[in-house]
Amino acid sequence: MKSFFIFLWSFFFFLFIGCDKNDSPTAILANLEGQWVLDRVVCFCYFGEAGTENFDDQQLWFSKDQLYPMGPNNDMPNIAPIGKVYDYSISGEILTINQSGKKYTLEISGDTLSLTFVDNEMIADNEISFYFKKGTADPSCIDFSAVIEDGICTMEYAPVCGCNGLSYSNKCMAQSAGVMSWENGECE
């Protein structure tokens, strides 16, 4: 009888308390895919006069198993050097960039993604958190397989505005970045 009571209690516990279907790895991946635009960075670092930082041109794109940091230069913060596609894995709340082994605590709340570097406690002041807002670009805007790292393009200036909201100096630069469509002229 005692075994039956324990079984019954366990059944109702998991039935009513159990796992939230939105916390499953599949749900996290579905919410993660697409464009994320860097909103703010919290760290012991300097980006100019406080309150004047603008990270709008720093983006992070996710597909099922790859991520792609985008932006005009590597001087601004992002979770990995821009212009390269990285494989990643998620275990629980930890996102790992496979090529570098860097780990970030991942949290999605509504249209906000936060990635906090899992720091080495023996190194002072290496804590950094990135906060991204969900972008509006269609996920098909970027083709990860079309990215040409260190692509060679002419330096002609014939600007185009990519479907991701970033300006490129010419069509070749947009194509090398994996951008699938664009309009002539700079983004506004």
List the predicted regions and their residue ranges:
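N-terminal hydrophobic targeting signals that begin at the initiator methionine
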Residues: M1-K2, D20
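Sec-dependent signal peptide recognition
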Residues: K2-S10
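C-terminal motif of bacterial Sec signal peptides marking the signal peptidase cleavage site
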Residues: L15-G18
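Lipid interaction determinants
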Residues: D20-G83, S89-C141
